[in-house]
Amino acid sequence: MCNSLNHTLTCREGSLPLGAATVRVVLTTVCVVLISMAFSACRPSGDKGRIPAAAEIAPILLFNGAGVSPGDVAAVEKILSSEHLNDSTVNSPRLNGMSESHIRAYRLLIVPGGNFEQLGDSLTASTAVNIRNAIRNGLNYLGICAGAFFAGNSPYNGLNLTSGLRFEFYAAEARGIRKAAVAITAGGQTLDQYWEDGPQLTGWGVVMAKYPDGTAAVVEGTFGSGWVILTGVHPEAPASWRRGMDFRTSVNIDNAYAATLIRAALNRELLPHY
């Protein structure tokens, strides 16, 4: 550590007895090694101002900044942990300070649920451009609920990965329902999913799952060289979110579907679709 530097400063050649040439050579060598170690130990460990090498970073960048639900960040992290997938979290100020190339050093950006207006407003217009360009040039993207709204042509610094399409809320919102267990059909099976003020995604990408009214609940597509998956429901939702609701699908099955979406986004896999 840095204390070793103070020790090396006492290793001056003039402090050695005259005629101790051999000892002088040995101690001088030790001093050089200790000084080198000291400066290495004192070097800042952060990645500010540089793009980390691929071996230094996790493959997944998880946004946990303003507007996203801390509970949903925790839910996503639990799925990632169960799948043995490493991630790094990034808040709004840090993401605002990242260049396109820095963002693109990751393989997948996940933006969880929350308030898409606050989320977008916490980021600068140039940051939205950097994210958009990173996706165009190969970064993959998974948007969950608010993250899906943010991917569209949102007036709140939206990424507009959708050629101008702005997503609307799923029809339950117009009936005054704010959260519910909603049955989606995906891959030939019916899954009861936790829904809370999420979008319907009709009009963009390939439809992988549908709401009961036939509108798109989960879609998949590309933007430039980037692979994009958007979901209006929360398959990652923990059991605690289900209180007071009736689900016919177990939380383990729903969470397994969340893991499927994450891996598909990470590995650029086309899932069963309509």
Set out the residue ranges of the language-model regions.
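Extracellular ligand-binding/catalytic regions of CAZymes and related secreted enzymes
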Residues: 49-55, 132, 158, 235-274
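Bacterial signal peptide processing site
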Residues: 43-45
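N-terminal secretory signal peptides that target proteins for export/translocation
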Residues: 1-23
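C-terminal motif of bacterial Sec signal peptides marking the signal peptidase cleavage site
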Residues: 38-41
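Class I SAM-dependent methyltransferase SAM-binding "motif I" and its flanking Rossmann-like core
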Residues: 136, 152-190
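Helical hinge/lid and interdomain linker segments adjacent to catalytic or ligand-binding clefts
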Residues: 62-155
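Catalytic beta-strand/loop cores that center a nucleophilic Ser/Cys/Thr
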Residues: 173-242, 273-274
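Short, solvent-exposed loop/turn segments at secondary-structure junctions
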Residues: 67-68, 115-116, 148-150, 166, ...
